[in-house]
Amino acid sequence: MSHSKKSLFAAYSNDDDGDGDGDDLYLEEHQKVTSTNTPSSSWFSNSSYKEKQENVIDTVTSKTQLKRASDFFNLDSDNTFSSPPPPSSSPPLYSKTEKKNNDKVKIIMKKRSFIDSSSDDNSDDDDNDSSSSDQDSSDDDSGGFTYNRKKYKKEQQQQENEENEENERKNRKKEKKKKRKDKKFKNDDKSMMIISNENSENYSDNSSYFIEKTGDKVFSSRTSTPNYNYDNSFILGMSDYKIGFSKKEGYQIEPISLTSFNKQQINNRYFTKPSSSSSSSSQSQQQLITVITKRKEIEEIEKVKPISNIKDPSKSNDDEIKLIVLNENNHDNDDDDNDDDDNETLERKTLKKNSELNKLVEQYPNNIEYWIDLVKFQENFQQFSRNVNKSKTSMYEKQLSIYRNSLLHNPDSEILTIEYLKLASKLWDQQKVLDLWNKVLSSSSSSSSSSIISEKLWKEYIEFCLSNFNDFKIEKIKETIITIIRKMLVKRRSFKVKDYNFMENISNLEESILQFISQLSKLLNQAGFSERVIGIYQSLIEFNCFEPIQLSNETQATLLKEFKSYWSSLDYPKIGNPNSIGWSKSFTILLNNSINNNNNKNNNNNNNNNNNNNNNNNNNNNNNNNNNNNNNNNNNNNNNMDLDNLDNLSIEEIEKLLKEQEDQENQDNENIFNITHKSKDLNEDDDNENNNNNQEEQEDNDSNSNDNDNNNNKFNTWGKKEIELDELKWKPLDINNNLEVNKEVNENDTERVVLFNDFYELLFRFVKEENKLELVFQFLEFLGVPISLLDDKIQPRYSFYHPQRRDSINSIHNENIISLLFKDLKQQPSPPSPSPEYPNWFKTFDKFSNNNNNSQNLLGLSDDKIKFIDSIYKLILENSNGIKLKEKLYVSYIMFKASIDINDAKVYTKSLCEKFKNLIYFDIFASLELKSGKTQQARTIYQTTCFYINQLINQQAQQQQQQLQIDLVYREYLFMELNLIYQTIEKDPQILKRFIKSNHKPIELFFTPLHILQCYLDGNYKQYSSSTFNLNTINQFLNQLNLKFLQKLQQQQQQQQQNSSSSSSSSSSSSSSSSSSSSSVDFLLCYCIFELLSNGFDGFLILFKRITSSSTNDYLKIFSIQHELLTIRCIDMVTKIAPLIGTDPKRIKNLIIDSLNQYYDHPKLLSLFLNWESKNQLINRIRIYFDLNSINNINNNNGGDDGGSSIFWLFAIKFESNRIGAAQRIKSLFEKAISTTQKHNIIFWKLYIEFEINRGRLKIAKSIYYRSIKQLPFSKQIWLLPFTNSKLSLIFNNQEFNEIINLINEKGIRLRILTPKVSN
């Protein structure tokens, strides 16, 4: 037998020298076999998972072992015994288990071609020869050998017994450790790890499978270490695949051939040296063929793409495992390609993505979204540069070039134009950008089409002007907004009645006009011109809501003429003032007086004609005078004729006429103000007072010129007086005949008197009634009445993301209104201010907490302003003919009264119930009693209202509007009872425990709400009694109620389909009919709560998602008013009731987060979220939510178009306001807030500066102040902060004070009193 064909087994069994070289040969060959037998280089094939072959012992003994055996048995060297005894009588040198292992090794080695068949036969022959020779030599001296052999057996058995005992001890210890580990695993996790017994039994006979020990005690003795190189096909459902890992893709399914077979492994897997045998070459060729066939089988398998990560921190971000596909061209370089993919840098990925976006832009140049995505993606390259400032400029230039190319393909795109100009303002000079804006606006306004003006362009232009500090002036902004409004009115005239969606276009345009009016009023008010703003709103409301009936068919010029006479009359106070009666009544009085005057004139003329004969000379003189007067009157009449024919004139001619009138009125007003100082004594007294004041000021300046503290005190007193006058003298001044009131006004301050010329350009009539009501609400919000935050009873007027509503939400600047935002938030105990343990900056946010719980003047309004607002409500509700939708106005008036005095509000609501018999007022009356803490009175009101509903149903068939009110009353009654149950258990949680321990069912808690639902569906209310429900029939009762809800829902859906089909012909009435015919929000809320009580949280969630995700129903379209009300009210009640019926808290939290994804800054949802997470003290979870949404807020990726929300940032700051060590986070929140469109909001800059002052960082506060005046050059409060804050004034010198005052005068900010003059 040659060495080339000698197997490892034969080489070990035949040792010619007998010196133990066979052992060395065995070690060498064993090392080679184990080295070649290692698996591939994948992460599964590391050293800890190799197959253990340490226990493998060969079956043939060597001569050294025989020598050791002869020494052990005391055999002489002269003895002829040279071979071991026969197998039947010789003691075993290994145990039975080792025999089995050797047999298995033989089978494995045969399968893997370690042993040739020929060598195996030769070895068997050698064994037979050796055994026959042993038998021949065993005849001599067998007695001593048998004795020693028995002795050896006993000792061997003792050793085996001791080894078995030690093994049993070790196994017991391992089992105990394993039991301890198994207790840590849950049933779900354990079931994932355990391999089923069926599958393991199928593969137990095959020795090549090493079953995992973890979790399966049957196969625990197979191996001491876990091995993961078993066949995965029965687990994964596919053969020839395994799970791999890479840095780029993570865990992925890859074919075994990808890592197990390459060229080197194929050549060196089974042989350490190249073999010349034909059998080995044929085997290697067959293996290559099998590898190629396996690769061809998996070529067409597609990749499994991962799921995109959800940004919810509470949800898992697990991706699906990818499947790698092998291509035919790169079989040999698979490992190299994977290494390249793993080592692919982030820069390479960004370049790939950038090239893809460039290709999309080239293919679809008219797609604006692709251009914007390409521009925004350029920001990703900034992370690869070391110098951030240089990279920003280069990035801006690159983005500008992309925008230029996009505008070449889309020159009429407003979005691209606006984004281009926004970006240019960051890089170019402001004057250059302003010139470019003027070109854009002139080209857009010169169009002769119906789109003569673009609201978006003008809004962005105003935003640019507010940020352009160098060129900013109040008068410029005012003129710009007025020109925009006039152009929009011209656009409204271009609409024709026959056009499609005529009323919708009119409504949208008028809403845009209201937005510009609101913006103008806020700018003028913040600049100090509050009287002019109030005059504008007064004139618009009088002109639209109190139009005289006699002038309803008159032209615009006639209306302006008559309104001018009414406004300039001194006998009739305007709306808001005491004893105001409105334009309509005052016009009838003026008309009657003019008729009486004409009659008197006619009588006088008759008397004069009788005396003509006696006074001829006098008559001649009088005629001459009369001729002169007639000439003057003719000129005036010509002007009036021009005003009467205003509709026939062009806009330019109208402007000329109005300017002429302005000049005349200005001259008249100057004459009026000159008349006020006729008496010489008053003039002399005033001059003496002024001289004395000037002398005192000069003496103070001389004495305190070197004393900076006194100078600062002067500036502080001046600034505080200026702010006090703004708060006191906010109302316009009426000009009386004697003009005695003007003594309190500065002689140079004529801004307190509002003239007709100050607002005549803004006078126009609204077409839609809803916009007239919105004008009133806008005026009330300007005066300090937050309509949307007063109470939940006031329904929103617009959808959540409507620009008008977003504007009112983001215009919060009053600290008292801010406290109303957090009324639903569970207040944390505020730390004591003098305590040294808490930082000083805590007192910055004291205004956030509403400590005034006595419901007296929650709005913090002054008495004169409360009377002014009350007069507006009364006049509009009692005397207005122009507003027909007064129900919302009544509700807001009740809630305004409740915020001032709740008892007065209850008396007024009771009078409305007796007057109108409206179910809504009954509901409000019950809610006011509930707020007062009178629960039983509120329940009595609801019960009497339900009995009254029974009478209404029996008398006549209820109309649609009446049915909606019935749904409202029952739903409010239901929610009141549920809230009482929740509040009772929240005060004493032991009640619920005692209730459950007494073997009561949770449904028994809600018998009263279920009774209300039964009466609601039956349409017949009955008094609740304890015998109403029976526990034995409760399931049958719930099934009946469920059927009734389903039947009612189907009926309403059928009516909706019929009404929608009938109203499809008339487009004007389609919007109103769809809302009135749909299922009411209150009915759907009752249905959802019933599902929660009867079928648990699962049944409720199915119904809620089915209702809110209905795409066919426009009534419940996402972000609509009805969708918002349904979502907010339903989740509010679910968070209270669902924990009482054993719902998992995590599911409730997920429901809140899903709703916040739709309404990310809703105050109610944010309060619910913070209250829910605060129970578990999970601060990081709340911070993660605000951090993730702040990115969307800054990048304008939320649902709104405003690009920022003041409510969102205020809630984020409020959450951190009472936490020690949160100063840096609050500072970062302020910086993020002012980087959005909230940079023009006063409240953030004001709080930020005060926050840094309380931290003791005055220099930082000073730098923030200079940043604030650059973004808010129109805000008088921001300008005067160094003059009103004593701490901040310490770091300003006299020169800086004087410079600030000069800038205030330059920007056109109004100052009521003279500024102190102090030398630098």
UniProtKB/Swiss-Prot annotation:
Residues 34-48, 598-640, 703-713 have a biased composition (Low complexity). Pfam families: NRDE-2 (PF08424). Residues 1-55, 74-203, 598-644, 676-716, 1056-1078 are annotated as: Disordered. HAT repeats lie at residues 348-380, 428-467, 864-899, 1221-1254, 1256-1288. Residues 14-26, 118-129 have a biased composition (Acidic residues). Keywords: Coiled coil, Nucleus, Repeat. Its main location: nucleus. It is found in: Nucleus speckle. Residues 146-186, 591-699 form a coiled coil. GO terms for cellular component: nuclear speck. Residues 96-106 have a biased composition (Basic and acidic residues). The keyword Metal-binding does not apply. Residues 170-184 have a biased composition (Basic residues). GO terms for biological process: mRNA stabilization; negative regulation of RNA catabolic process; regulatory ncRNA-mediated heterochromatin formation; RNA processing. Protein of the nuclear speckles that regulates RNA exosomal degradation. Belongs to the NRDE2 family. This is Nuclear exosome regulator NRDE2. The gene is nrde2.
